[in-house]
Amino acid sequence: MKLTTNYNDNNYDIFVEYNVLNKDYDFNYYDKRIALIDESVYRLHQQKIDLFLNKHSIFKLLIPGGEQVKTMHHYSTVVEKLLSMHVTRHSCLFAIGGGATGDFTGFVAATLLRGIHFIQVPTTILAHDASIGGKTGINASSGKNLIGAFKRPDMVLYDLDFLETLSQIEKLSGFAEIIKHVLLNANGHISKSETVLEIMHDVKDEVCLSELHAIDKWITFGIQTKMKVVHDDEFESGVRKFLNFGHTFGHAIEFHHKLPHGIAVMHGMIYALLLSDVTESDIMSLMRWMHRLGLKKLVYDNFDIYYELMRQDKKNEANEINFVLYYENNGYKVEQVDVKRLRKAFERLRKLEGELL
């Protein structure tokens, strides 16, 4: 399927289908073409990737996989390497890997020579979210994505063949962001929302997720949701903040427990719903489904640990912790939440986790 962004200008195409890398593209506009490739992805898909690179005369540069590449050290190393290759502002980088590879490559493209071209080639489910919207960045010692820029890709080539080699944890982590996009489309009681019921029917359990049931349908849905939100608010001054649903507590969980991003966000979404006006029965229904998909119970530490991490979140304002919350009659809103309310929701979360079979 071909989707096209609907900004006022500088739009780009997003291709989502199996075997998309084998289609014909014209990259001759770019004087140099360099792919920054997650080395783990390259090992798993070397033949497929090499065919694409050779067909389009793209030089390959292997980089570490995952969040470990998003450091100032790797940034400066890659930038110096690219400068030694005499790239120009008409050159193009190809990000072949997951969301972290896209974040990193996009940030390099945004800052090198004050901006060169780049194309996203996502290889994970999670990257469906990161490949849309133009957010790029690397991490600082004190938190994720604290150094970054907005940079739109020229194109997104989403080849679903890459998803076949994902581990079950990677599939679940990526599917979490799709769940987020589904919940962002909810209205009224979550348990009665048509889209929520539909995804629960399509992907009932861990086996369905493992076999990637209807994955093209739900990745496309996630991309369309993200595109609509980003079109309305590209630079995160309003409704785009809703895309941070589940991320405030989720980032604290991710940082402290060293969990995959999406897994942490699943816990974060449940916590955010507990801060909202959603009924416990609706929340338990959602939790049970997430656990059928493979989400494991988390042994939480002291609340104060998570509270201090949440205080460092870059979405906060005036030292107040901001959360994206859901109200059944009014939809989503960004709200400052005080420590007493946060602590109470945390204790409820622990209680509900204990009640799960």
Swiss-Prot record:
GO terms for biological process: amino acid biosynthetic process; aromatic amino acid family biosynthetic process; chorismate biosynthetic process. Its main location: cytoplasm. Zn(2+) binds at residues 177, 247, 261. Its EC number is 4.2.3.4. GO terms for cellular component: cytoplasm. It is found in: Cytoplasm. InterPro entries: Dehydroquinate_synthase (IPR050071), DHQ_synth_AroB (IPR016037), DHQ_synth_fam (IPR030963), DHQS/DOIS_N (IPR030960), DHQS_C (IPR056179). Binds 1 divalent metal cation per subunit. Can use either Co(2+) or Zn(2+). It comes from the Bacteria. Its cofactor is Co(2+); Zn(2+); NAD(+). Pathway: Metabolic intermediate biosynthesis; chorismate biosynthesis; chorismate from D-erythrose 4-phosphate and phosphoenolpyruvate: step 2/7. Keywords: Amino-acid biosynthesis, Aromatic amino acid biosynthesis, Cobalt, Cytoplasm, Lyase, Metal-binding, NAD, Nucleotide-binding, Zinc. The keyword Lyase applies. It catalyses: 7-phospho-2-dehydro-3-deoxy-D-arabino-heptonate = 3-dehydroquinate + phosphate. GO terms for molecular function: 3-dehydroquinate synthase activity; metal ion binding; nucleotide binding. NAD(+) binds at residues 99-103, 123-124, 135, 144, 162-165. PANTHER family: 3-DEHYDROQUINATE SYNTHASE, 3-DEHYDROQUINATE SYNTHASE, CHLOROPLASTIC. Belongs to the sugar phosphate cyclases superfamily. Dehydroquinate synthase family. Catalyzes the conversion of 3-deoxy-D-arabino-heptulosonate 7-phosphate (DAHP) to dehydroquinate (DHQ). This is 3-dehydroquinate synthase. The gene is aroB.
